[in-house]
């Protein structure tokens, strides 16, 4: 076979005719309707909120921290003095009772003394348990502030300290096992303080936040249904108070607070103070019309509207309790709002007209 000689390099001239200027002279196609496609007409949602109504709902969201009162107030001094006097009165009455029983019979006196010692031991145990619960709640509040400060300053050492405290609080919660295991593997890694706080919030608190949303929604649904079927307003108020108190306690237990009786009272006071900072607690007919607009209020009957109002109030109390008992502030995760629950509450208390009467 003979080898072919390579072609010598040469130059070529590009013709300007390739631009096809005649394409620009073509007339545009006339618009015409397409009739062979199925046209789907969107049906408006009668319970959908407008942007203005949703913005008004978000105003109710308690996203501010209630200021803590420091020092001794007159009410604390009064109740403290009364408590000391009552303790002295109980002690003197117990002593007189034991002396009187000893004067009657020795075995009665010794029995009364033993019962008094048992009662005193049980009282001391209750006081210690309440103090431990109060200390646990205080540690959660301090951890919340430390985490916010570490994330703001991007301090890695402070962030690791806050994350370690969060892991110790969540050690007994099975929902956080996977997140704690992930953070255990990052002990020797170099991570920025803000990113470490966000990672701990995502991996540890996200399952708890999901469960907290479920608790708030279920409590709001129960309040809404009971309000809609109860014959007396007093029953509505009593059930709202009962359900709100149970919701506050369950949310605190969910995040590892486990409050006692005194701890629950202090926690409830913080939640009420938290709500007082962000607005009024009571929501009447005029307030709910300002919140969700006159359109939604006119779509529901009076009793069903009251159910939605009480359900929203319960949801707002739950969100405020979530803000108070959550160890870390909302940073990486989205904070729940009133608008996240109103759709479910409305669906419970009323059906859409097209679903209720499909033939009309």
Swiss-Prot record:
Superkingdom of origin: Bacteria
Stretches for region Disordered: 1-30
One cellular component term from this protein's GO annotations in UniProt: plasma membrane
Entry keyword set: Cell inner membrane, Cell membrane, Membrane, Transmembrane, Transmembrane helix
Main location: membrane
Annotated localization: Cell inner membrane
Transmembrane segments: 77-97, 108-128
Membrane topology note: Multi-pass membrane protein
InterPro entries noted in UniProt: DUF697, UPF0283
One Pfam family it belongs to: DUF697
Family affiliation: Belongs to the UPF0283 family.
Protein name: UPF0283 membrane protein Oant_2119
